[in-house]
């Protein structure tokens, strides 16, 4: 029979693509497509995410946490402004956003980054929707960054990824991806990345 509820994530991310790859075709067409997609799926977007604000490339380029937060808010504001122009209700749109952060090995700064972002998110929503009484926390996905990785002693990257993973968890992320410590064909790199997650989840208190 017909399904009344769809569970999926589209994660529309044009701004992140333009910023990461230097594409010069930035225009309003993609936002028009996004607005059209919203209206077509409106009523079926329960527990789904339509927009992904992906700032992992900033972390992988070595930018500091303040710069990452500023750019995240700038990107989010751009989406809000463009969708508001196209009559998309922001009180519904804010529930459809997910955020993806790269997490470095600066332990306390990365914890603070995620916690600060939750406060900034609430302030941003209040600025756009001052009458909104209840604001949910943003959904945050984290990926351990590779900016501090070394190729001369690759196994030391295990310490960096573990530290970054702990920061993400203590900062309050919802989803965590641990990047393998090596891209040089190390057979157990993916397994060790999985083990880091399992140890932090099941054996750490």
Which residues fall in each region the model found?
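Catalytic alpha/beta active-site cores
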Residues: 1-106, 131, 137-141, 169, ...
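Short, well-ordered amphipathic alpha-helical segments that serve as non-catalytic structural scaffolds
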Residues: 79-82, 120-124
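Conserved, mostly hydrophobic/aromatic
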Residues: 121, 171, 196
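Non-transmembrane, aqueous-exposed alpha-helical and coiled segments at domain scale
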Residues: 126-129
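Short, acidic/polar
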Residues: 158-165
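Active-site or pore-adjacent capping/gating segments
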Residues: 163, 174-205
